[in-house]
């Protein structure tokens, strides 16, 4: 398939025009007329993925490698080194970020990974009506995500009746959350204080931990295309001791 044909398919699946104004989803590298036979799916780009990717292939990531304007590709700093190596190997790059959060990933994570039934949606926020204690909810999340520990903020409510969920970094949405507990990642100190003042408990899922399912979610929609689709092993840049 041509890169343009793959892009058009992805645009039908998850329209790029619904991405946030600050986002940079879409074709970031490549020639629209390039013929593609192999596609790699990954949460992010790293040197191992570029090394293992075949020439003339396509990488589809969740997070855009290019966010801010680059004045040059002179040195070996991030992301310049990756971009130069991909150009050398004629590797194309498409990113599906906030558009895919809205259309697929938040829903997939809530239903298929956490095993909840969605009550309603409000853009990036998924709401679940499911009464349980805060401790029971924490245990449920750890089991479903295979986590040993969670960073939490408990407002003291004994019964959690409504849960809000957002993959990735959802801390900026706290003022809009109408729930007893908010599940997301990358919560900041003052965001936790704001949540406590609003009687909202927080469960920090971790950014990587909540979005690592991007590749398996997208792969199911690409299986009928005449492409070899390879799910790469995305790695969390953080470790816990």
Curated annotation (Swiss-Prot):
A divalent metal cation 2 binds at residues 63, 207, 211. Gene3D superfamilies: NIF3 (NGG1p interacting factor 3)-like. One of its GO terms (cellular component) is cytoplasm. GO terms for molecular function: metal ion binding. Pfam families: DUF34_NIF3. A divalent metal cation 1 binds at residues 62, 101, 211. SUPFAM superfamilies: NIF3 (NGG1p interacting factor 3)-like. It comes from the Bacteria. PANTHER family: GTP CYCLOHYDROLASE 1 TYPE 2 HOMOLOG, NGG1 INTERACTING FACTOR 3. Homohexamer. Belongs to the GTP cyclohydrolase I type 2/NIF3 family. This is GTP cyclohydrolase 1 type 2 homolog. It comes from Campylobacter jejuni subsp. jejuni serotype O:2 (strain ATCC 700819 / NCTC 11168). The lineage of its organism: Bacteria, Pseudomonadati, Campylobacterota, Epsilonproteobacteria, Campylobacterales.
């Amino acid at each position: 398939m041509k890169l343009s044909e793959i892009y058009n398919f992805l645009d039908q699946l998850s329209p790029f025009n619904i991405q946030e104004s600050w986002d940079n989803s879409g074709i970031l590298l490549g020639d629209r007329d390039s013929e593609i036979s192999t596609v790699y799916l990954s949460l992010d780009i790293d040197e191992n993925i570029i090394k293992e990717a075949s020439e003339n292939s396509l990488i589809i990531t969740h997070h855009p490698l290019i966010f801010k304007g680059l004045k040059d590709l002179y040195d070996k700093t991030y992301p310049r080194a990756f971009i130069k190596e991909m150009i050398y190997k004629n590797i194309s790059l498409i990113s599906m970020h906030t558009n895919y959060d809205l259309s697929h990933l938040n829903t997939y994570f809530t239903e298929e990974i956490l095993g909840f039934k969605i009550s309603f949606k409000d853009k990036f926020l998924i709401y679940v009506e499911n009464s349980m204690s805060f401790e029971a909810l924490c245990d449920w999340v750890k089991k479903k995500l295979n986590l040993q520990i969670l960073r939490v903020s408990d407002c003291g409510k004994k019964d959690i009746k409504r849960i809000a969920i957002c993959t990735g970094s959802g801390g900026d949405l706290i003022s809009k959350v109408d729930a007893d507990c908010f599940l997301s990642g990358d919560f900041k100190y003052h965001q936790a204080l704001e949540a406590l003042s609003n009687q909202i408990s927080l469960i920090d899922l971790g950014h990587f931990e909540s979005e690592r399912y991007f590749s398996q979610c997208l792969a199911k929609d690409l299986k009928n295309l005449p492409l070899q689709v390879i799910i790469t092993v995305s790695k969390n840049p953080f470790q816990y001791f």
